[in-house]
A protein has these predicted regions:
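C-terminal boundary of histidine-terminating zinc-finger modules
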Residues: 78-92
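Histidine-centered active-site loop/cap adjacent to the catalytic His
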Residues: 89-112
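A short, charged, Gly/Pro-tolerant segment at domain boundaries
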Residues: 102, 112-124
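Conserved catalytic-core segment of NTP-binding enzymes
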Residues: 1-76
Length: 124
């Protein structure tokens, strides 16, 4: 992602990790990681930079949960009402499947290693 997007993510994560807020971060997801044309599914074009989210995850000691590419079929299938993410044989389907697996794994790890998140009431 672009540097301004990384700066915004860094600010948000730092806010949530602050002792006064203390909201656990499961990890980062990079949307629009690269462009893959349908006719060349093995090709990746990094339109917004490469590995910025990976570097941010390493810097902040949080896992990179997934990278979601830009593919034209997302829009086309969305317009038809058939989410391409459900097609496990597609590039985007594989990306969402990996993301889902990583979210489950990090949630299980968080639940095993950290105390339950406390609910804070802000009003009566």
């Amino acid at each position: 992602p672009q540097e301004v997007a990384l700066a915004d993510a860094r600010k948000g994560i730092n806010m949530y990790m602050n002792d006064k807020v203390n909201v656990p971060i499961l990890g980062l997801v990079e949307n629009m990681s690269w462009f893959t044309p349908a006719e060349l599914p093995e090709n990746k074009y990094y339109l917004f930079g490469k590995e910025g989210t990976k570097r941010l995850a390493e810097e902040l000691h949080v896992p990179l949960l997934g990278q979601i590419p830009i593919v034209q079929s997302i829009c086309e299938n969305g317009d038809k009402g058939t989410p391409v993410a459900l097609d496990e044989n597609s590039v985007i389907g594989q990306a969402f499947l990996e993301l889902a697996r990583n979210v489950v794994a990090q949630t299980e790890k968080r639940n095993a290693e950290l105390a339950p998140t406390q609910v804070v009431k802000t009003h009566k």
